[in-house]
């Protein structure tokens, strides 16, 4: 099972890594550097994990919809920067930095992720 690994340091670079390499790739990120891990890119079912210096976010593609993992019901929209772009995101969907990678490491049982975690419309 492979994952696309994108890093902005400061320019964008991308490579394919094995799921077993995700934890080490995450740990090797220099301080202050953004990364995105994408499983099953451009397919009906996909998982995208953006890791930022202060937080992570997880987006799931499933059943022709996108879902953002949430850890609270706080729907206040906040401005965030992911990679080189600015977004607004529900505060309750901003996760602890390590959590995104922990979710990604469970992707081999993709369907169970939808039931194990809480999700908001993405």
Region spans (language model):
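Short, structured protein-protein interaction patches enriched in aromatics and acidic/basic residues
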Residues: 40-56
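Short conserved beta-strand and strand-loop elements enriched in small hydrophobics
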Residues: 35-37
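Acidic, proline/glycine-rich low-complexity IDRs
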Residues: 1-33, 55-122
């Amino acid at each position: 099972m492979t994952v696309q690994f994108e890093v902005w340091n400061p320019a964008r670079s991308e490579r394919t890594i094995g799921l077993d390499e995700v934890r080490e790739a995450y740990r090797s990120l220099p301080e202050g550097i953004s990364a995105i891990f994408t499983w099953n890119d451009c397919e009906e079912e996909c998982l995208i994990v953006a890791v930022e210096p202060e937080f992570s976010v997880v987006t799931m593609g499933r059943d022709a919809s996108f879902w953002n993992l949430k850890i609270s019901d706080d729907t206040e929209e906040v401005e965030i920067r992911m990679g080189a772009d600015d977004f607004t995101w529900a505060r309750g969907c901003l996760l602890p930095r390590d959590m995104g990678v922990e979710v990604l490491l469970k992707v081999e049982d993709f369907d169970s992720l939808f039931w194990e975690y809480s999700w908001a419309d993405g």
